[in-house]
Each structure stands twice: as C-alpha cells, then as structure tokens.
C-alpha cells in the first residue's frame, strides 16, 4: 500500500502542474467574461453546444466554458472560483477523484465540470449522501446554472424538484430551498443537471427495470456522474446491496419464540462470536442444549429453517446493539449508519436479522420480504461512461479506487496553508480513565472560550460524554441520530466562542463549522444596513475564536478506518484557520481489542504506568495506525470479494434487463414464441417416442400438448384420433408444429394483431419478473452456502461461478418454456361490435384448426382479462382477482404467480 501511495504522490505534482497551465488559459478569458451582459450567457451556452455538434471536443471548449461558469457564479451567488477549485474541476472532468480538504468549497468546484459535460445534452448527475445536501446544493447552485441557460433538479426519497426562479416556497426556512418546485421523477431526470441521493439513483434504476410500460421509465442514461463524499458512497456503502423487496409471508410468532430461546443461552459455553467477521454460531454444547429445549434430534437434519432463525436471533443478541447499530423509535427498529451516524429510515437488515431484532426488543414484527430486484452501488456506478468523485479523504483508499473503479486520485492543494495542530494520541489503560481525561480537556478549553467538537462512535457513548459534562456543569449541545432535526442549528452554533458540541459521526462529514458561528448571507438579509451590522458582529466573534486557537476537535476513540478519523480532524483548520485535534484511546476500545492492542498493552506494562497516566509516544501512534491499516485491508479484501461475486449476478442482470427492455420496446416476439412452442412440442414427442421399439405414447404426448394449448374433451379426442393415424415421431412432430403455427395465426386474426402483441408483452414481462425473482432467491441461497466448499479444497468463487451459470442457463430455458405454456391460456374477451369494426370476420370458414380453437377450454387453464373491481390490493398469496385458473391444480392462480401480474387490469 505504501509503495502505491509514494507513486501516487510523485505523479500528483506533475498532474496539478499540468492543470494549473489550463487554469492560466481560463484566467486569461476572465476579462472578456466580465464584459458579458447577463442575457448573453445563454447565447454563449448555445454557441458551445453548436461547436460540440460540429465535432469540437469538450477539452477544446473547456477553458471558455470554465471562464463562463466562474463569472456566472460570481454574478449570481457572489462566489468566484479560486484557481485550486478550477484545478479540482478539471480533475473531475477527466474522471478522477479530487481530494479537497474541508472548507475548500467542493460544492462550487463541481459546477464547471457539470456545466461542461451537460452541454452534450445527455444529462449529468451529482450524487450526494443525503436528502438535505441534494436539495440544498441544487437550490444553492441553481442561480448559476439558470444564468447559463441550463436546468437543474434534485431527487430525494419520494420527491423530486426543479430549480425555478419564478416559483417561491413561502414555507422554506433556508433561502437555498425557496425556488425548488416539485416535479415528477421523469421531469427531474430530464434536467441538464440532476442532484440526488446515491441510493435513490440505484433504486430508480431498479424501478425502471420493473415497469410495465416504457413511458413509466424515469432515467435517461448513464453519461457522467460526480460523486460527492465519494469514499463514503463507493467504499463504505459498497458492501450494502440496494434491494427492492415485497412482502412475502405473514410475520409469525417464530421470531419471538427464538428470541426467548437464545436468551437462555450463555456466551461462555453455548455460542461462539467472531467480532472481526461479525459472525456467531452455536457451539457443540449449545447445539445439544437447543435440541433439548426444542425436543428435537439433529436440528441440522430436521429443519434448516430452525437453524436459520436461531442464528438470526443469536446475531441480534450478540452482534447488534441498541443505540449503536440501531435505535427503537415509535415502536420501530431503525438502522443507524455506522459511518455517518444518521438514521436509515425505511431500510431493513436482510436475512431475517431485522425481524430477530424486533423480536428481541419486543416491538411489532414486520413482514418478511422477498427480493424483487437488487444491485450493488459498485455495479450501478460502473455503468456510467465517465465517473468522478470529490472528498476530503481519498488518498488512503487510492489503491481501492484504482483497482475496483479505475479511478485515479488527485490531491488538490489548499487555497491557504494548513496551520492546524494534530496532537499525538493519548492512550489509557481503561475506558473510565479515558473519559475522565476527555472531560478534563473539554473543561480547560471551555474555560478559555475555545469551541470544542467531541466526536463519538455511537449514540450510547455520545450520551455518556454528555452525562459527564452535565455533572461538571459544562453547557453543551448533543447531536446524534435521535435529534437530527436540530442538526443545522447545532452546527451553526458549534464554532461560537465557548461552544461545546458532542456529536456522533454525523458531524464528521459534509459539515462546515465556521469559527464565530454561521454568518448570514446577503440573500438572507436584504436590508443592507442590518446585514453590514451583522457582518461586523460576526467578524468580531470570529476574531475572538481565532485568538483562543480555533476549533478544538476531540476524538473519543479511533475508528476502524483512518478516513473517518481524518474526516473528524478535518472539521478544524478550514481555509487556513488555526485549530487543534487529539484522539483519546483506551485498551478497551474495539479497534485495540480486536486488531493489535497487545503491543500497546505491553508498552504500558513495561513503563508501569498507572491507570490515569496516558501513554503518548510515536510508537503508540504507529501501532494504532498499523491496526487501522489491517482493518482497512481486511475490508478492502471483503469489498473486492463482493465485487467478484456480484459481477456474476451483474452479467445475468444485464441479460435479463436487456430482454425485458426489448419486450417493452415492442419488439415483435411472435415468431420467437411460435418457434419456442414448436420446440417444446418437438421435445415432448421425442420424450415419449422410442423408434427402435416402435413405441409412441400418443396419450402422454397429447396430455403434454394440451398443457400448452388447452382443448375441450371433444376436440382433444379428435386430435388423438389424428395422432393415431401418424406412424413416426417425425410425422407427429411435423403435424403438431404445423398445428401450433396455424392456431397461433388464427388466434391472432381472431383477437387482432395489436391485442396479440399486448398479450405477448404482458405474458413475457410477468414470466420474466416472476422467474427472475425466484432466481435471485436461489442465487442468494447459493451464495450463503458456497463458502463451505472451501473445506473440500475447492475454490468457492469458481464453484459459485459454475453453479450460477448452470442456474442461469436453466432460468433462460424456463423463461421460454413458461411463456410457451401461458400464451394460449390467455382468453381475451372482445366486444363483437369492436371486433367487426376492426375487420375481424366472426363467421369465417371453419377449418379443423379454427374449430379446435373455438372449442378451447374457457375456464380450465384460461385466464380471462377483465378489470379488477375490488379496491383492496390483493396479497401476493391471495387468489388473483382476474379469476385465472391453474390447469394443474384446478385452483385459482395466486396473485404472485399469475401470468397477468403486469397487465394494467390489475391496477385500480
């Protein structure tokens, strides 16, 4: 890793120097840009678009485009790009990760690159980490794009907006949100520039591949994306697949039963926890104990579902802790993001873990779910033709960015020299001694008026520090996922003189703490006299905080990742401000306990240090950093492994979604379906024929044929007589294949070609969706158990690839077979008058084929397409409201299995 970093740093300087030369060209165009009238910016944008259409490249027009943006930003929002911000933006245009320190203005840096690439008319995306930032940045930068003649939008959970200067939201408290007008998802994606949350881009991609009509699609391609906080999105969240699911079966008491059962198990004798791998399993003693409590023999042979539920309950008990991995709010278990400290409302742990936690906490258990569609962020963002990113901390993960995403990291110089002091770690033997030292340090800073930001890793530790400060009589603000609604207010005051803020990782990323407190912009205070007075007051407070040393950042423990620690440090020392940072560590901290605290413990023993005396030495800092490098390497391998496995499913997903898109686009499937049915029939004939023995089982051939094309008993008898007159399997196969084609064409004439194309599309979509869903479940089961192959000296990944390939081949074969078996079972009820008006003769000459067609079964195996009258949405396992009957069971189709599940008739 260190060799990789040294190469990176060597090439970094050369690249920055090259980009600075381009910035000089941009700066030379400043004079002409300043002479432009406001209305002329739009015409210059139009000129650049024309140049592109004539073959000029983006690189050719970059200096002119960037000069326009620089001037437009200065005029519209009063912010002019620094040279280093233009360097960062050139890096973004070239598909790199730009590492910019806190306060260097990443939001503004992205604008020139977004503008330049949006000139192609293909749409560009700015990806953020939460709803607030997506809306804020779209509204904040909206005036810049508007002056340049481009549209800008924002997509967040369940809502979309477009920047519209003529629209005003009177309820918006933040001036940057006032001109965001609600629009449809499709209109938001049609904008030149779209800001949005990473998860919503992924979910919209999945939803677009589940629609029943092309007009329902929202996204329009994957041209260029700039990912803000790129390390958080592409690395921290990469291990979490994005899943769209639907309720499967009703929740039962089994989770409560197993939660009670594991409460009787002891961690000392009954189960084994591996905190590094985050796994837990029963010991031999525990297995015997569980079998005795359940009154069963071998639970691993009797019912694997029991083992699954017990292990889920064990994980809920041993690995998932309240106020750390989740909180309970309003009777619901809500996940807390381990990297950002924010609530992930609406997301759920998979594999029954969430239900097991709900049972543990005694709240209502929500239904289990079945995966409808899934994609990892790694594979979603790799679909973009060009990808770039911004963050304050990328260099430690440069190797991963290169190997997985083929992204180079460029370290952007700061606008002003960094003067912050980063003190060495203070290491204590116990957590108690560490907390006492932290409280003492906070007290000293508070006395002299220095603002303090205390970073904790979880809500419970956040509240422990808060209680210590309360006892010492130190006023403070607490920021965690429980009171996230006050975040903006708390952060705006965190830089004031004497302010003490205790926060989780929420304050470690994307947060700008301004010394002296947040200042009012001219947009917020239109009265210039009042604004000037407020500005003078702010400057006075700002200078007072500078005099006492700037923001003091205290980390209460080291995180597994150096990036998260660096993010916390980065809240201090913005834009050349002074600042101070220090981390406090104890031997009880997770990282010391799991990844290398033994070396530090030995040092403390050698020096014979008492509990309340810290160890501060470069050897200690190196030991802690080595522990973090170990963890980062472990997680890198895990994510690389995830990509290798997910790539297998990704290729399959692309093939299935391509087939689904072709179906939606109205590709004529008639000939393909006829050939598939003929192939099915041919296979049936050969299956029940033995030419050598001169044995042909005509009755079984007929039975199988009728499962594809259902006849009434009289027509079936007539068909059997015809089969008995044929001597060889080839004759029989040829006759039945001809019959299939004639019946298909006759049916098409009967219902009209337009309706037949709709039937083909509905049946194909429903079969694809249903079987793809089952395939995802099967692949998930394969993935879970494949690791055991390693014990047999076989490579699990190779085994997974081989078996997944076989399963996929089976899926594609089954798709064709299912469509063949369903297409003739759809009976279209047409109004005779309408049929006549469309030129369909209802009294056409009856041939043997049309006679057989008229006698097809009308109930058994025939699905009648008709409007659903009930307003109640049926459950997945309820009988389908369309009344379709399964010919095999003679029972109504379940809603989830019905061939018409995507037909508009199923909608209210």
Language-model features and meaning:
Residues 64, 84, 136, 460, ...:
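A generic structural signal for residues located within well-ordered alpha-helices
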Residues 327-334, 340-347, 575-576, 583, ...:
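Extended, charged helical/alpha-beta scaffold domains that provide interaction surfaces
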Residues 454, 502, 772, 808, ...:
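Hydrophobic, well-ordered secondary-structure elements that form the walls
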Residues 1-608, 657-658, 675, 679, ...:
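Conserved P-loop NTPase motor core
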Residues 449-462, 665-667, 692, 721-724, ...:
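Short, Lys/Glu-rich amphipathic helical modules
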Residues 874-880, 884-908:
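A short, cysteine/histidine-rich metal-binding "knuckle" motif
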């Amino acid at each position: 890793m260190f060799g990789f970093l040294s190469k990176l740093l060597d090439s970094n300087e050369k690249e920055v120097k090259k980009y600075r030369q381009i910035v000089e060209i941009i700066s030379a165009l400043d004079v002409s840009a300043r002479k432009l009238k406001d209305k002329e910016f739009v015409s210059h944008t139009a000129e650049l678009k024309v140049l592109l259409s004539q073959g000029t490249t983006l690189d050719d027009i970059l200096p002119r485009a960037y000069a326009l943006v620089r001037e437009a930003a200065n005029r519209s929002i009063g912010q002019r790009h620094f040279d280093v911000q233009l360097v960062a933006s050139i890096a973004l245009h070239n598909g790199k990760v730009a590492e910019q320190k806190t306060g260097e203005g990443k939001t503004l840096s992205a604008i020139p690159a977004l503008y330049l690439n949006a000139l192609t008319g293909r749409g560009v995306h700015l990806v953020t980490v939460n709803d607030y930032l997506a809306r804020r940045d779209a509204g904040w930068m909206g005036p810049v794009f508007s002056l340049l003649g481009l549209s800008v939008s924002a997509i967040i959970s369940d809502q979309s907006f477009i920047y519209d200067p003529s629209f005003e939201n009177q309820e918006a408290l933040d001036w940057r949100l006032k001109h965001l007008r609600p629009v449809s998802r499709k209109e938001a994606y049609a904008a030149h520039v779209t800001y949005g949350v990473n998860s919503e881009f992924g979910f919209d991609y999945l939803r677009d591949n589940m629609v029943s009509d092309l007009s329902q699609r929202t996204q329009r391609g994957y041209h260029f994306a700039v990912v803000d906080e790129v390390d958080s999105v592409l690395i921290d969240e990469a291990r979490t697949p994005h899943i769209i699911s639907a309720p499967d079966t009703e929740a039962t008491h089994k989770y409560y039963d197993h939660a009670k059962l594991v409460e009787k198990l002891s961690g000392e004798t009954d189960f084994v926890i591996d905190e590094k791998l985050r796994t837990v399993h029963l010991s031999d003693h525990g297995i015997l104990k569980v079998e005795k409590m359940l009154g069963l023999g071998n639970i691993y042979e009797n019912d694997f579902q029991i083992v699954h539920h017990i292990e889920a309950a064990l994980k809920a008990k041993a690995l998932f802790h309240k106020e750390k991995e989740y909180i309970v709010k309003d009777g619901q278990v809500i996940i807390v993001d381990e990297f950002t400290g924010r609530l992930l409302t609406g997301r759920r742990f998979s594999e029954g873990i969430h239900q097991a936690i709900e049972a543990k906490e005694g709240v209502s258990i929500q239904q289990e779910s079945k995966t409808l569609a899934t994609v990892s962020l790694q594979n979603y963002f790799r679909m973009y033709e060009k990808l770039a990113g911004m963050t304050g901390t990328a260099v430690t993960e440069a190797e991963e960015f290169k190997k997985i995403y083929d992204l180079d990291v460029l370290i952007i110089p700061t606008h002003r020299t960094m003067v912050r002091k980063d003190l060495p770690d203070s290491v204590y033997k116990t957590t108690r001694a560490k907390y006492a030292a932290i409280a003492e340090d906070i007290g000293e800073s508070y006395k002299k008026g220095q603002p303090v930001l205390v970073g904790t890793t979880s809500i419970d530790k956040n509240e422990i520090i808060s209680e210590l400060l309360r006892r010492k009589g130190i006023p403070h603000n607490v920021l965690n996922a429980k009171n996230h609604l006050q975040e903006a207010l708390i952060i705006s005051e965190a830089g004031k003189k004497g302010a003490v803020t205790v926060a989780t990782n929420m304050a470690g990323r994307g947060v700008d703490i301004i010394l002296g407190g947040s200042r009012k912009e001219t947009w917020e205070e239109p009265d210039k006299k009042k604004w000037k007075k407020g500005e003078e007051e702010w400057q006075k407070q700002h200078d007072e905080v500078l005099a006492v040393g700037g923001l003091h950042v205290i980390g209460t423990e080291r995180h597994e990742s150096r990036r998260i620690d660096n993010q916390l440090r980065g809240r201090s020392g913005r834009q050349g401000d002074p600042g101070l940072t220090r981390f406090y560590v104890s031997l009880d901290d997770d990282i010391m306990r799991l990844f290398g605290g033994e070396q530090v413990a030995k040092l403390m023993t050698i020096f014979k240090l008492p509990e309340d005396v810290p160890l501060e030495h470069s050897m200690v800092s190196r030991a802690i950093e080595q522990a973090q490098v170990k963890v980062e390497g472990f997680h890198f391998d895990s994510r690389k492994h995830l990509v290798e496995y997910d790539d297998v499913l990704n290729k399959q997903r692309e093939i299935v979604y391509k087939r689904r898109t072709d179906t939606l686009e109205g590709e004529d499937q008639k000939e393909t379906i006829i050939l598939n049915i003929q192939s099915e029939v041919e296979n049936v004939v050969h299956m029940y024929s033995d030419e050598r023995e001169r044995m042909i089982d005509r009755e079984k051939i007929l039975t199988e044929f009728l499962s594809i094309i259902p006849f009434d008993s009289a027509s079936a008898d007539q068909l059997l007589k015809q089969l008995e007159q044929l001597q060889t399997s080839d004759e029989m196969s040829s006759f039945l294949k001809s019959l299939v084609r004639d019946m298909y064409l006759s049916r098409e004439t009967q219902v009209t070609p337009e309706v037949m194309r709709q039937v083909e599309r509905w049946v194909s979509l429903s079969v694809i969706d249903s079987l793809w869903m089952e395939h995802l479940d099967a692949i998930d089961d394969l993935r879970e158990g494949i690791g055991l192959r390693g014990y047999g000296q076989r490579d699990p990944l190779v085994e997974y690839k081989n078996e997944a390939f076989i399963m996929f081949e089976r899926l594609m074969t089954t798709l064709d077979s299912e469509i063949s078996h369903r297409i003739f079972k759809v009976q279209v009820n047409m109004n005779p008058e309408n049929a006549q008006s469309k030129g369909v003769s209802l009294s056409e000459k009856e041939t043997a084929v049309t006679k057989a067609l008229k006698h097809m079964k009308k109930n058994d195996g025939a699905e009648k397409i008709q409007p659903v009258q009930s307003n109640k949405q049926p459950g997945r396992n309820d009988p389908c409201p369309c009344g379709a009957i399964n010919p095999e069971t003679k029972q109504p189709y379940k809603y989830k299995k019905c061939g018409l599940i995507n037909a508009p008739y199923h909608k209210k």
